[in-house]
């Protein structure tokens, strides 16, 4: 695994007056580029040719420089990494970055400095380790089924990685499980390799909330955790085709029973629930410091369901910026309680890097 000292050695050769913010052109890239631009950084987008025009279409969010690739896995080529290093690049990982490049490759082959702790991406991508992390934080999780033969009621079936709900399904029995699984494999919705890492959880009733957190080592606003503070910058819920199935439509066609995320909506919680939600973020940070020091750094999100009779249940963690933050590119209801200026998650990441450069503490938030 690439060590912290390996990255520090690369950073030592950087011209810190010319650091660029870089990511793959997908997911939250527009928000990341916009936030970096506002904070005074040059930006570099790694883009496939078919997406170039999109990222050139937004004057305030287009990258200053685009590097075109045929496929995103090319960034693992040592020569390509050298190009990024010569541009004094700090990579901002997001869901598409992890999915296209792969968490193992990020840990073993990608030696370009990244914002945050790359160990947290490995913990996010492994269902067992993720569960250990969440439970170590003292949070309630859905009941887990180790084998399809244990299914005794409605369950939710998930696959590993940042897939945005693609291929997920619900079933009520072992037979239904295999029918749905085989159908998805045959249609190419999921890969054969995904089947061995399948996750089966109890199906939960309630309202979905996805709070967006930022763990800062450099700012003192928020709730204390570890050596820094946890801020809450927004909350969203995801829009999925399955949502349309519950609008009173008669004879709902099967294609509506799909959990692929297609968009996001802004959400505001009842203020009485905020202390508990903020404490979740603190507990997750404290647990991460013990499990994989120095722990998670920067942006993360908890995927939760709330029901008045049961409270919050946390069913997943995303250990980096999430697509739901795109609804707050101009700041959120919560970020304006902390900052006088509009503060998106993309800008907040750039702000942390900016402080690290100014205080000569960049290595504390880069790995």
Q: Which ranges hold each PLM region?
A:
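A short beta-strand motif that forms the metal-chelation/ATP-contact edge
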Residues: 154-158, 212-213, 304, 310-321
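Short N-terminal binding/cap micro-motifs at the start of the first secondary-structure element
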Residues: 29-34, 53-54
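Positively charged, low-complexity intrinsically disordered leader regions
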Residues: 1-10
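Short internal beta-strands
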Residues: 41-50
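ATP-dependent carboxylate/phosphate-activation module, predominantly the ATP-grasp catalytic core
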Residues: 213-288, 318-350
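Active-site nucleotide/adenylate-binding loops and adjacent lid/helix of ATP-dependent enzymes
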Residues: 73-74, 120-233, 271-282
């Amino acid at each position: 695994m690439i060590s912290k000292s390996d990255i520090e050695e690369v950073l030592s050769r950087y011209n810190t007056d010319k650091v660029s913010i870089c990511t793959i052109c997908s997911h939250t890239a527009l928000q990341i580029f916009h936030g970096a631009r506002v904070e005074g950084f040059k930006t570099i987008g790694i883009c496939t040719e078919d997406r170039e025009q999109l990222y050139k279409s937004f004057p305030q969010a287009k990258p200053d420089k685009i590097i075109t690739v045929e496929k995103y896995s090319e960034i693992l080529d040592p020569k390509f990494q050298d190009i990024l290093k010569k541009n004094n690049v700090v990579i901002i990982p997001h869901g598409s970055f992890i999915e296209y490049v792969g968490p193992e490759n990020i840990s073993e082959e990608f030696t370009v400095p990244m914002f945050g702790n790359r160990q947290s991406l490995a913990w996010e991508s492994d269902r067992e380790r993720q569960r250990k992390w969440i439970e170590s934080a003292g949070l309630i999780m859905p009941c887990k089924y180790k084998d399809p033969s244990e299914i005794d009621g409605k369950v939710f079936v998930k696959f590993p990685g940042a897939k945005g709900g693609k291929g997920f399904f619900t079933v009520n029995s072992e037979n239904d499980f295999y029918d749905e699984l085989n159908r998805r494999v045959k249609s190419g919705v999921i890969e054969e390799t995904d089947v061995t890492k399948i996750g089966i959880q109890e199906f939960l009733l309630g309202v979905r909330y996805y709070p967006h957190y930022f763990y800062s080592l450099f700012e003192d606003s928020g709730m204390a955790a570890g050596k820094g503070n946890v801020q809450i910058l927004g909350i969203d819920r995801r829009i999925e085709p399955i949502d349309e199935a519950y609008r009173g439509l008669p004879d709902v066609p099967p294609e509506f029973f799909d959990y692929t995320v297609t968009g996001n909506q802004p959400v505001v919680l009842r203020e009485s629930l905020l202390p508990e939600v903020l404490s979740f973020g603190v507990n997750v940070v404290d647990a991460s410091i013990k499990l994989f020091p120095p722990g998670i750094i920067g942006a993360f999100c908890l995927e939760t369901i709330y029901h008045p009779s049961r409270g919050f249940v946390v069913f997943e963690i995303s250990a980096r910026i999430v697509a739901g933050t795109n609804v707050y590119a101009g700041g959120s209801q919560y970020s304006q309680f902390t900052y006088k200026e509009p503060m998106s998650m993309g800008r907040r990441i750039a702000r942390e890097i900016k402080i690290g450069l100014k205080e000569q503490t960049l290595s504390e938030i880069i790995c």
